[in-house]
């Protein structure tokens, strides 16, 4: 189908699925687990690593301080997202360093508790190197859970339907970088950075809850806000989802737009 409109993609560029181990960060008495890069779930883990230094529960949930720390933690995490997140098969990503307690504290210390910073930069490491998403979660009486998310990107994806097959091809290749020095630069057989991130919360080594949401770069921000709503403010899942939230929309190449 895509060859009919002049695409250079061929069968060698086909998708290959793989099993991966989730990456987890401790928060209060639970663990937040996300998929590793090439997705943005890592940003939620970085936000948690930063926010665990804030002791948010000492403020009411709607206190401006809580919104301030959430917004600044997101900005810090997304600076690293734009610099480092890519397909780990093609780039050396400092995953351990990005999630270390020392680095989380270092990034937290950059936050001015009284004012938003004009700008942040990504961390430096000495190493070389729109409504289009559906989320589904299900659990059974035995505690088995599935956390599933899918998206064609850009609403109708590529707009191309393989003849006779009845589904739309996605176009997430848009999220490759065109900068040849960037770890997420496009390359044959390479997976682009993407935003779709199913999540789990673990407790004592066992799954406690599967969850996720839609909304591009809102997703890691939403994961973190669900986590603090439940485990800093004692909300149940319904209350955590209904609560007010902050979101700062970020594109790798476009200005940031923040909303509450």
Where are these regions (language model features)?
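Long, well-ordered, tryptophan-enriched scaffold segments
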Residues: 1, 7-8, 12-32, 37
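Single conserved hydrophobic/aromatic residue that forms the stacking wall/gate
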Residues: 1-6, 11, 251-260
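Short, small/polar residue-rich loop motifs at catalytic or cofactor-binding pockets
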Residues: 19, 130-133, 194-196
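Glycine-rich phosphate/pyrophosphate-binding beta-alpha loops
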Residues: 36-41, 149-159, 213-219
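Internal maturation/activation junctions in enzymes
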Residues: 53-152, 164-165, 172
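Active-site rim segments in enzyme catalytic domains, especially the processed small/beta chain
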Residues: 144-209, 233, 237-238
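Alpha-helical support elements that line or immediately flank enzyme active sites
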Residues: 214-235
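Compact, glycine/acidic-enriched structural inserts
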Residues: 237-252
């Amino acid at each position: 189908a895509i060859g009919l409109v002049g695409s250079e993609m061929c069968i060698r560029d086909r998708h290959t699925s793989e099993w991966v181990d989730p990456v987890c960060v401790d928060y209060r008495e639970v663990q937040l687990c996300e998929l590793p890069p090439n997705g943005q779930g890592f940003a939620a883990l970085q936000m948690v690593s930063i926010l665990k230094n804030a002791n948010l529960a000492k403020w009411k949930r709607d206190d401006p301080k809580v919104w301030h720390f959430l917004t600044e933690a997101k900005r810090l995490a997304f600076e690293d997202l734009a610099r480092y997140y890519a397909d780990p098969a093609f780039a050396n990503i400092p995953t351990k360093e990005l999630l270390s307690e020392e680095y989380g504290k270092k990034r937290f210390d950059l936050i001015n508790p009284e004012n938003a910073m004009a700008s942040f930069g990504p961390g430096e490491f000495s190493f070389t190197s729109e409504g289009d998403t559906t989320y589904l979660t299900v659990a059974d009486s035995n505690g088995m859970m599935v956390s599933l998310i899918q998206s064609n990107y850009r609403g109708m994806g590529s707009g191309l339907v393989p003849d006779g097959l009845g589904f739309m091809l996605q176009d997430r290749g848009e999220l490759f970088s065109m900068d040849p020095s960037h770890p997420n630069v496009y390359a044959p057989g390479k997976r682009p950075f993407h935003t779709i991130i199913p999540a789990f919360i673990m407790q004592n080594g066992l799954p406690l809850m599967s969850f996720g949401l839609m909304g591009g770069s809102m997703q890691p921000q939403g994961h973190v806000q669900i986590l603090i709503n439940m485990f800093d403010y004692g909300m149940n899942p319904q209350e955590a989802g209904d609560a007010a939230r902050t979101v700062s929309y970020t594109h790798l190449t476009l200005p940031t737009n923040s909303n509450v």
